[in-house]
Every structure is written in C-alpha cells, then in structure tokens.
C-alpha cells in the first residue's frame, strides 16, 4: 500500500525537551498540560504565538492537535494563540500539509468544520499536490470525505499529482473510493498521460477497489493507458488471481503490448502454466504457433525468446518503461516507479536506471534493495558521483 499522506511518529526522546513535551501534549489532546508548557516556554521570551516556531520535521503544535482531532486544543491554539489553519508545514514529514489538511485524517468532522469556519482553504494543495479531500480519502475517513464533498469540493480535483480517486486506489481505500464514485468521480481519468485509477488499483493489488471501479464503468482494458491491465499483470508476474478476475470482467486478451506480444505470450515467457491455461481458450490462435496448446505456446515462445530482440525495439520499450517510471516517481508513487524501472532494466542494464530504482527503494524503506542497486550502479559507472551518493544513502538507512 502507498504511504498515507501523513503519518506522525512521536519524538523518540519523548518529553526530554519542552518542545517535544509541547507536541506530545497537543497530539494527546492534553489541554491543561499544553497550557502549562506554553506558559513555561513563553515566560519572558515573547508572545505565546512563538510556540508555533517549534516543530518536528514541519509538524508544529497545531498540526499535531489537528491530526488527533482534539477540538478544544485546536480552539485554544487558534483563538487564543493565533494559530494559522492554512500554515504549511515545511519539513520531511509535513511536506507542505496544513493543519486543516491534517484535521481531515483525524476522522472528526467537528474539528474539520471548525477549521473550515476559521478560514480553512479547501483548494490549497501540499507539496505532493494533495488537497484536504486527498488527505481524507487516503486515510479512509468516510464521514470527512462526505462532509468535504457536501461543501462543494470538486470530486475530481487535481493539482498536478492525480485526483482523489487515484489516491484512494493506491492506498487501497475502497470505502472512500466508493463515496467518490457515488459522487460521480470519473473512473477513467488519465493521470499524467500514463495511468488510470484501475491500473493503480491493480498495481497495489486492491481487488475491492478494482471491482468498484469496473462496476462504475472503468475501462477494463485501460486502452487509454500505456499498457492494458492484462499486459501489465502477465509481464510483471505475481498477479495470477487478478488475471482470472480481469478475464471474468471482460478484459480482452488479444490486445498486445507495444512490441506486439499478447498476454498469453508474456505469461509463457515466465513459464506460468496456470496463466497460459486461463488465457488459451480466450486468445485468438497465433498463426506462427503450430501447436495451440499450453505446452505448445510455452515451447514456441521460449524458442522465439532465444532470438535477439531488435535493438530498436529494445530501446523503444526501455524508453517507454523509463517514462512510466519517471511519471510515477514525480507522483511520489515509489512502488510503482520501482517496478517500472525494474522492467526497464530487464531490457538493458543502465547505471541511471539502477540509480533511480535505488532511490525509490530508499524512499520505500528497503535499505538492502537500495544498496544492491547502488552497488550495481557503481559497477557500471565506478566514478559517477550519483552512484557513490546512492550507496552512502543506502548505508545510512541500514545503520
């Protein structure tokens, strides 16, 4: 599952500092404790509003109270201390999210309504292009999602990184996804010219989201995307149950990839008899395959695969996959990007591709995978500064 928009972990040193104690009091909704700390911190050091300068990775006291849905604490911070409900958190955790956005993830409608009544900006986006509706949807907060839509937030609002429906699919939030669809979200919307909510749901293995999207009219073949669902699933592997579902839903197994290969051929390349067996009766026989059977298809495809792919085809495919990976990376969908970089590597090793996949794995918390790619990158380009940097970053994560 993709990372939810905001997941805050309490400071590791707990209450050893007044700043941490302040944030912990806000997170836990302890108003009395919070007031005591505010008085202690600001005694002789300026006005109480100075407490908003204390933060942890961009998360200040109002962000913390908002995320916890602690309404009384929020009222105190806004009305008595002058907290700004639209102040973006500048840091690696907040990523530009405002207290108003974070309040959506509390699931507490009264807190969200309070922030809205005090100037909360429904259209403002954080550093990842997510509005408050994106935050509510990604966290699976159904009541908040309904409330925001009732206030006129466009159901397909997109600030450059995809609409809320895309976020629901990548976070496996079938309940909020259904709410969006009930409010007429477009199930066939194209994100950055490369993917759709249905393809995203497949990549993240969310069968519930896929069923809802298809029921709402999503194109089961994703013809407007760079590849069909069956092509992706049979090429990638590990999606056998999803292939069975897609075929029952009417997916066409006769649509090839950009090199003219059908899903049955891609499954045969991986020697997956179960998938070939499912696809065989629904696929139009290939004239060049003399024995149209499970073993016959696998044998033919394996023999054909021994022949060298034309260099221009290999390069074209690699460019396509890299483009898809780059798009996913810009959307901060690192799992999707990592998989696409891996497919591109299968078409020819490249230091750049290994470096890019290394940083994806780093951001996903996979230190060993990141280091492995960084080392491979250094083998291909020993003196490349980026390769050395990737290796050092992976080592830091593993410490």
Predicted region positions:
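Conserved ankyrin/ankyrin-like repeat signature
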Residues: 33, 72-73, 110-111, 143-144, ...
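Ankyrin-repeat intra-repeat helix-capping/turn positions
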Residues: 29, 69, 107, 140, ...
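Ankyrin repeat domain, specifically the short helix-to-loop turn at the C-terminus of the second helix
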Residues: 38-49, 75-84, 113-121, 146-154, ...
